[in-house]
Amino acid sequence: MTPRAIFDRARLAQLHGRELASFRAARPRSAALAERARAHMPGGVPMSWMVKWPGEFPVFVEHAEGAHFTCVDGIDHIDLCLGDTGAMMGHSPAPTVESVTAQLSRGITTMLPTEDAIAVSNGLFERFGLPYWQFTLTATDANRHAIRYARHLTGRSKIVVHDYCYHGSVDETFATLDGDGRTTNRRNSIGPPVDTSETTRVVEFNDVEGLEKALSEGDVAAILVEPALTNIGIVLPDEGYNEAVRELATKHGVMLINDETHTICAGPGGITRRDNLHPDFLVIGKSIGGGVPCGTFGFTQEVADRITRSVELEDIDVGGIGGTLAGNGLSMAAMKATLEQVMTQEAFDHMIPLADAWADGVQAGIDAVGAPWHVTRLGARAEYNFSPEPSRNGQEAHDADDFELQQYLHLYALNRGILLTPFHNMALMSPATTRADVDAHTAMFDECLRELFSQP
């Protein structure tokens, strides 16, 4: 059974119209700013994704702190999106703000190292177990650099990714499987430089046999994975799947890149440390700087030795790795404070039980109306999906999507002061999130479903 079979679509449209009217009425200042913004920004936003929020215009933020933000219309919001993980440790955590503020007066960027870089790289080694680290401004760039090194070291060109993966704006990852199981450009991918079938081989998540086949041709440089899919809903690995990926990578001489940018929600060392995984490279960004643009990639001793032997000093600045602002003093100050004082085990001991409570509340609301939906959990992150059973791969998760329904549920929440990520039904807990915040969502969600599934 699908959601379309158990409630009236006409009623959904009617309720959605009501919520749109309420949204407009409550936010005149955001509406006015959106109109002004359209003069010189397409869609009235500084970054195109911001048009995907469920209202007719984005909510403009006046102030964000902890797990709440206030919009320009004076409405307080519980933030369960948290900048889609960028603010997973809360908005403007005090240690990060203090460190960044001090660094601003000492110099923002010099293209020379600061002492903070030593502390950050040491801390990342202790956290993830990889001994060497380099820094970027985004996880996207960290992924790009890891892929380039993998190609350089293996002499191979292709990469393998999971169907419906997400690794930032890395060109090679905007690929999916067509109906015949062949790699093709992802729908609505904007301006791909080449057909992704030339650069990429796509396999389904949790498909060990498919991965073995993809690697068997001997032309794959790297497997780029999230240890659990997070951007098509949460898709958890089967028992032993990540270990099988490692074994197959080793067997076929392929570099394994674990992208923990979202899955860091599993704990201070992400799924990699929690499950004792052993990638050749590990990538992380977003949350490690407390909201300041940061990214990093770590690698093994073997990889470091091979890079040292094969990269020439004379051309190191034109080899496609690095960037003028990467490793700047401000980013390093932000990462040092965030990693040492904010992204701690104690923080996750607070966050993960709250995510469990959120998931329990959502599941209770689903069960109360008999909806064939389920909730999936991953550390401090949880998500509800419009299918009766958890998805085992990206295609199953994609097939369970319902954009109209999602937009309504998100708008209903937003009108009651609760923000979810706009891309799917994900909630993220921060160290500043409280049980009262979770309970407010539980009550709102229950009310929303009872109205949607009742007869008018």
Residues of each region from the PLM?
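Conserved N-terminal phosphate-binding loop of PLP-dependent enzymes in the Aspartate aminotransferase
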Residues: 1-456
